[in-house]
Amino acid sequence: MSYAELQVTTHFSFLRGASSAQELFETAKALGIQAIGVVDRNSLAGIVRALEASRATDIRLVVGCRLDLTDGMSLLVYPTDRAAYSRLTRLITLGKSRGGKNNCILHWDDVIAYSRGMIGVLVPDLPDATCAAQLRRIAEAFGDRAYVSLCLRRRQNDQMRLHEISNLAARFKVKTVVTNDVLFHEPGRRQLQDIVTCIRHNTTIDDVGFERERHADRYLKPPEEMERLFSRYSEALARTLEIVRRCKFSLEELTYQYPEEAIVPGKDAQASLEHYVWECAPDRYPEGLPQDVLKTVRHELDLIRTMKYAPYFLTVFSIVRFARSQGILCQGRGSAANSAVCYILGITSIDPSTNDLLFERFVSQERDEPPDIDVDFEHERREEVIQWIYKTYTKDKAALCATVTRYRAKGAIRDVGKALGLPEDVIKALSSGMWSWSEEVPDRNIRELNLNPDDRRLALTLKLAQQLMGAPRHLGQHPGGFVLTHDRLDDLVPIEPATMKDRQIIEWDKDDVEALKFMKVDVLALGMLTCMAKAFDLIREHKGQQLDLSNIEQEDAATYAMIRKADTLGTFQIESRAQMAMLPRLKPRTFYDLVVQVAIVRPGPIQGDMVHPYLRRREGKEPVEYPTPELEAVLGKTLGVPLFQESAMRVAMVCAGFTGGEADQLRKSMATFKFTGGVSRFKDKLVSGMVKNGYSPEFAEKTFSQLEGFGSYGFPESHAASFALIAYASNYIKCHYPDVFCAALLNSQPMGFYAPAQIVGDAIKHGVEVRPVCVNRSRWDCTLERIEGSDRHAVRLGFRQVKGLAVADAARIVAARMNNPFASVDDMWRRSSVPTEALVQLAEADAFLPSLKLERRDALWAIKALRDEPLPLFAAAAEREATAIAEQQEPEVALRQMTDGHNVIEDYSHTGLTLRQHPVAFLRRDLSARNIIPCAEAMNARDGRWVYTAGLVLVRQKPGSAKGVMFITIEDETGPANIVVWPSLFEKRRSVVLGSSMMAINGRIQREGEVVHLVAQQLFDLSADLVGLADRDTGFRLPAGRGDEFAHGGGGPDSRDRQKPVVPRDMFTPDLHIDTLKIKSRNFQ
């Protein structure tokens, strides 16, 4: 018997379905089901995933949606043609616009207005008067396209209920059709289905009651079983295929039209693009286009004409032109930097005359995929660009892509644990022991937490959390991926309001958009561009120099000397500990060295075993040999090692005779070979082509294995070059203007890898004077103050460093102060009219000390004497006299002041940093008594020496390709130390590694040149030692930068992972690995 299941809910219904489209379609194929109708509730968010599953399994997808109306009526709708699909997407858009984020409000009148061309299937409850009224309405609205669902509920009166619904349907001439209301692909998912129901209703399994599914039959059944269950309703069974035949629409029919751009009068898009290219060329090449660049430009323009991509280039050009007209720093990156056309138009900054670009990496005729140009803007001004796009293209034709927020380990543990009723402390203990997003918790670790792994609920929590990981939780908004259309965008996909004001998103993410070959424009935010813009402003204001990205001195010797010393904290791309480890070995001296540096600390070159050969050849320890001059021409700059994606493509083209398009297909197949195995079809062509061109079979095989190893992670050279430009500029500013760099970096927070405490500490080491927050001198941003008798400047910390202080309150303080400093707390309160809460925040940040000489407790005592607001009589007098008039005189009180240690903790608590002593300095006597030496002494010890040191934990890194090895950075008053923890020790001391604010390490020094590590043998938690600093029973909280993935969350699927940290800064960054397990190559100096 043939059967199609028309009522299938995937997990893209968000906490309703418990299986993915892939699982459902694969199961359907195994069971012999001919078609699947996906009907997620009020949403088409998962329909493209269903299309991809349909393509993979060759099971027909029927596009549909379940509409839950405000009057309680539920309806399955299926568009029969392309026009009906557009009406469905507009209908959902209408409901989302009323309901807002994660809600959809639709009425029956809306359905009537948009129902033409749709099949409607009523989902009835009981065969009562309400059901009869609903049948009458659906018959009138849908005519012969009206059906009613027959679905078992596993109740005693099931057969009677079906019989009565069938009779009612006959009375209103509505046809019946069998559905199974599928929520999961196989019976084993029933438990997870109950759990997601509990999560959705914010309740526990003990209290969920009848909200959970009342039976376990909501899984896919084979046609034979459906025939047995509905033996009395053979016609209704047959109608499942009838509906499939009537629904001729397929998502493959969606044809995307790019918007027509504002073009040169009388010219089409291609002619306009060429006009702008030749018009802009003199700006880039005042002395005329070099012949090789001219040839490249003509080749690119021909390919753009063939692919009809001119409107896309014009769009990006217009966006960049708008940003520059507003003084917003921006720069294109990614594969687009391979384009000479993009360079001439000012979209990217990589000069094709000095860099060997490969346009096929960007646009390829064989690949037939839309181009993807990523443009970075200052992160604090990107919203101006976004709103300009909405204004220019209108909200009918422009929206951001969605991102799918998925469950990760911690979020899954928390939600499943709550649903199963575990105590909060148990949930917290479990989740705090999780490192990676998919990590399992061994029984031994559970016992270390004083929990019983044999407890049924605990075991079930871990089992179901594993099943929940990766499941969608809700939709968020893409950082800046815009989809723009010629016609209405909601003809293609439903649109919903974003959480942020004046933004809207489509229901599909970037992968869905790519699957349907839509073009998107990426308007991305880059914090370092904000930092650079603010740095240029400060240099202009205080140094009298006009600097920007285009006129910074190139190849500056002092800048490269600083980079070679790995003195790059806070700079762009080469600031991480892994990058710092490579810098003393690679020793960059030119811009191209910096390009290599950016790209080499990635999993790709490491997995392809390219890092060590490159370094050995660079150091002269290994000869550089090229079998042919052609290969030397391709790999000469990288010493015979294919470090970049473009290198791999050029090797295939030059050595094996691949076309540009074939080489790009090779790159893409390598990127997915672990999942598709598609690379094998290229291996024979590559190896045989190289042998044919005179290379030995052994060399050809070695070349292929190298490319295969790094293909999935290889970095485009053009992308590395774009990033290297900003990396160089940031290092130049840090080298020559360290005071400016510190202030600009603090004013651009949150961004980057490091917390303000590390940024300020590094600036002080570079001789920058940093002054505390002051109620009479600080502004919102950090500023520069000239040092008396010198041409140097000090950095004055701004009010932005004070935690909890509102921008509006800070603005009122600055405006009231003008050129007349506040004389007292009372004076400040009256003249600024800020609430006392703002004064308390400033007092806790010690902002009254620098100018008013009030210690924390004195300032707080003075604030206690203030009213909620000044009395009108005194306020009027103060305004008339232009000075504060006290309401009453407070007697002087001698308060006991805080200890130095207590002040340090208060500094960290309220400003995130301290200008006093390092916290560990207060513990040095006790540590020395335990034979614990300073970090600097440990890092200067000879190779092989056993040392015992301790410090605050700043960074934890566990690179994905490091096979479980963890790298930890600690710090004391003498500087940082770099710790290596082997997997066995990590598992034994997991709670210490993941939970310590301060850690002691006993281990052996490993040294190779300037690269030094302490390989841990024993780990001890010294967090309790920090408690005594403030003479109180609260833990010390070390502020963490945004790179802190363990404490802040990893930008991962479950946004609720981002809880306030009670542990120090840790992170998980898979792309920061250098030498797999050869730890001598890492340097955290």
Curated annotation (Swiss-Prot):
The species this protein was found in: Agrobacterium fabrum (strain C58 / ATCC 33970)
Main location per the UniProt record: cytoplasm
Family designation: Belongs to the DNA polymerase type-C family. DnaE2 subfamily.
Matches recorded under HAMAP family: DNApol_error_prone
Primary role: DNA polymerase involved in damage-induced mutagenesis and translesion synthesis (TLS). It is not the major replicative DNA polymerase.
Keyword Signal: no
InterPro entries per the UniProt record, alphabetical: DNA_pol3_alpha_NTPase_dom, DNA_pol3_finger, DnaE2, DnaE2/DnaE/PolC, DNAPol_HHH, NA-bd_OB_tRNA, PHP_dom, Pol/His_phosphatase_N
Gene Ontology molecular-function annotations: 3'-5' exonuclease activity; DNA-directed DNA polymerase activity; nucleic acid binding
Reaction catalysed by this enzyme: DNA(n) + a 2'-deoxyribonucleoside 5'-triphosphate = DNA(n+1) + diphosphate
Record-level GO cellular component terms: cytoplasm
Protein name, as recorded: Error-prone DNA polymerase 2
EC numbers on record: 2.7.7.7
Keyword field: Cytoplasm, DNA damage, DNA repair, DNA replication, DNA-directed DNA polymerase, Nucleotidyltransferase, Plasmid, Transferase
Any Gene Ontology biological process: DNA replication
Top-level taxonomic group: Bacteria
SUPFAM superfamilies from the UniProt entry: PHP domain-like
